């Protein structure tokens, strides 16, 4: 999810995408990437970082040209999720997703409610690795494209990296 800033009281959602994975992080399905139309006034008043970043990626122009509304995209994503997952059955997963949820509560409440109340936040593992095993944290290479789909794919790769190099797990029990 990309927004015009970090404050859901004054900023808005401008791009969303979604990927469904299984518990082993294999991609099962991928939604369309939606640029959500927002007013020129809102886009013209983004802070310097968002103006530069979303301008560089072309997202600002895509948002200006889009006819998608938040409500329309919310319904499309609900339809997409319901093909794969029953309501309230899966946590939201990604990087710093508490921020995404804050915006969803305000602008896409039905979608936010479709997720389980728990989160699987890759940022938690990143912060733990920084504190407990800094070389592991430094070994993660982030491109930081700030495009919704790219960021999701990068979060999945980051989670795979932490699973392989940071989390210790017992071998799966053999079927008897």
From Swiss-Prot:
Signal peptide feature range: none
Recorded GO CC terms: cytoplasm
Any GO MF annotation of the entry: 3'-5'-RNA exonuclease activity
Keyword RNA-binding part of the UniProt annotation: no
Active site residues of this protein: 117
UniProt keyword list: Cytoplasm, Exonuclease, Hydrolase, Nuclease
Domain Exonuclease: 2-159
Locations listed in the record: Cytoplasm
Family: Belongs to the oligoribonuclease family.
Protein role: 3'-to-5' exoribonuclease specific for small oligoribonucleotides.
Protein's name according to its UniProt entry: Oligoribonuclease
UniProt organism field: Neisseria gonorrhoeae (strain ATCC 700825 / FA 1090)
Lineage: Bacteria, Pseudomonadati, Pseudomonadota, Betaproteobacteria, Neisseriales
């Amino acid at each position: 999810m990309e927004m015009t800033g970090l404050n859901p009281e004054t900023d808005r959602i401008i791009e969303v995408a979604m990927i469904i994975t299984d518990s082993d992080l294999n991609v099962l399905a991928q939604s369309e990437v939606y640029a959500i139309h927002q007013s020129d006034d809102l886009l013209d008043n983004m802070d310097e970082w968002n103006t530069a970043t979303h301008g560089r990626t072309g997202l600002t122009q895509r948002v200006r040209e889009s006819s998608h509304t938040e409500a329309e995209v919310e319904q499309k994503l609900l339809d997409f999720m319901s093909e794969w997952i029953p309501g309230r059955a899966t946590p939201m997963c990604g990087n710093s997703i508490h921020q995404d949820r804050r915006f969803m509560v305000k602008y896409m409440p039905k979608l936010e409610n479709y997720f389980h109340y728990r989160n699987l936040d890759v940022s938690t593992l990143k912060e733990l690795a920084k504190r407990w095993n800094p070389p592991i944290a430094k070994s993660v290479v982030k491109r930081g494209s700030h495009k919704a789909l790219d960021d999701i794919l990068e979060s999945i790769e980051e989670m795979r990296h932490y699973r392989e190099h940071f989390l210790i797990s017992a071998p799966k029990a053999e079927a008897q």
